[in-house]
């Protein structure tokens, strides 16, 4: 499975970018279950174009505070028990995600009921993807 995280804004602080890089590197160690992971800075038009051209192997998941609440276990099941070869997560800008993009997404999930900065949402998502991969791989990172 390939995972692509589409986001609108750049990191404001060096430590945010460092955390991003750490989790991308950690996730990349699990090539047997996640063949590729990357983050792509994009605009609304770029996302709309991708949504119009999506195929049956792609799943677009928007992050929105009003979305379905997922536990770590829910995310793990969603990531590794689906038929999609390409998962594309959309992390909104300061203004959130446009209604049309939310409506065209396959799923809308919430990381928290609280409002998060786009960079924190992106880092939390990466950490949870990493945690899910460690659970599936019986890696000691996740302790129950």
Locate the predicted segments by residue.
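Short hydrophobic segments within beta-strands
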Residues: 6-8, 63, 90
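Ser/Thr/Gly-rich flexible loops in soluble cytosolic domains mediating phosphotransfer, phosphorylation
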Residues: 84-104
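Short glycine-rich anion-binding loops that position phosphate/pyrophosphate groups of nucleotides
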Residues: 65-68, 93-96, 114
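N-terminal beta1-alpha1 ligand-phosphate binding loop
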Residues: 1-27
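S-adenosyl-L-methionine/SAH cofactor-binding core of RNA-modifying enzymes
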Residues: 30-88
